[in-house]
Design a protein with these regions (language model features):
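Conserved hydrophobic/aromatic pocket- or pore-lining residues that grip, position, or stack substrates
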Residues: 1, 32, 78
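Active-site acid/base region of carbohydrate-active enzymes
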Residues: 1-4, 38-39, 51, 56-60, ...
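Low-complexity, Ser/Thr/Pro/Gly-enriched N-terminal "stalk/linker" regions
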Residues: 1-21, 199-200
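Solvent-exposed loop and edge beta-strand segments that line ligand/cofactor-binding
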Residues: 13-29, 63-75, 142-157
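Alpha-helical support elements that line or immediately flank enzyme active sites
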Residues: 25-51, 157, 167, 173
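Short glycine/serine- and small hydrophobic-enriched flexible loop segments
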Residues: 34-37, 80-87, 162-172
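Hydrophobic faces of stable alpha-helices that mediate helix-helix packing
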Residues: 48, 75, 79, 157-164
Length: 202
């Protein structure tokens, strides 16, 4: 975690479990907020927004994965969770949705620039949600090697679609977001082309 000296975790965060998993995990937290939104929407929105604040999000746009390895990559589900929380709360808090969208643009750019190493819209990953079933350590790939992953690429396609859906919601209030709709549609199209060209099996 030596590259995360900016991180200042003094907030009350949702944990996967008080006993077995007493630490935050950014993607677990995103799923928790969808449930919390039915009970306390403001708390759910706070949980999502705080992980995108400058004292958590890396200056390069990465989100901290979990306490023992902030650098790991978790599935990018924050956009999906933010939109679900917005909808559960009555689709009225556009200030929240807009703020989250702007921060997620930084995170999305980090994924595109860092994880698509070959620029072919086929994404690498690491740990991407497959708990304890990887046949190899996908986080620590040997020097000179790389793994292009079907699941990493699928998660990025999902991320594109969620950002597109958020941009559509925002564009209904502010036409300036229409160009962002096209941006994410173009990204999604590029990923589908990349999948067709590369193949997702070996």
């Amino acid at each position: 975690n030596q590259n995360w000296r900016h991180l200042d975790a003094y907030d009350v965060l949702s944990m996967p479990d008080a006993w077995e998993y007493p630490w935050f995990a950014a993607w677990d937290l995103a799923f928790h907020t969808v449930v919390f939104a039915h009970i306390d929407p403001e708390y759910a929105k706070y949980q999502l927004a705080v992980m995108l604040r400058e004292w958590y999000m890396h200056p390069n746009g990465a989100l901290p994965a979990y306490e023992w390895s902030f650098d790991d990559r978790n599935p990018p589900v924050h956009a999906w969770a933010a939109l679900r929380v917005f909808e559960i709360d009555g689709s009225r808090d556009f200030t929240f949705l807009q703020g989250v969208f702007h921060k997620l643009l930084i995170n999305f750019t980090w994924w595109v620039n860092r994880v698509d190493a070959q620029g072919n819209n086929v994404f690498e990953g690491g740990f991407l949600g497959l708990d304890n079933i990887g046949p190899i350590d996908r986080t620590h790939v040997p020097a000179g090697c790389r793994i292009e992953q079907a699941d990493g690429t699928a998660w990025m396609a999902f991320y594109c679609l969620q950002m597109l859906r958020i941009a559509m919601r925002l564009a209904a209030k502010d036409p300036a977001y229409r160009s962002m709709m096209l941006k994410f549609l173009e990204h999604f199209s590029g990923i589908t082309d990349g999948v067709a060209d590369a193949g997702m099996w070996d």
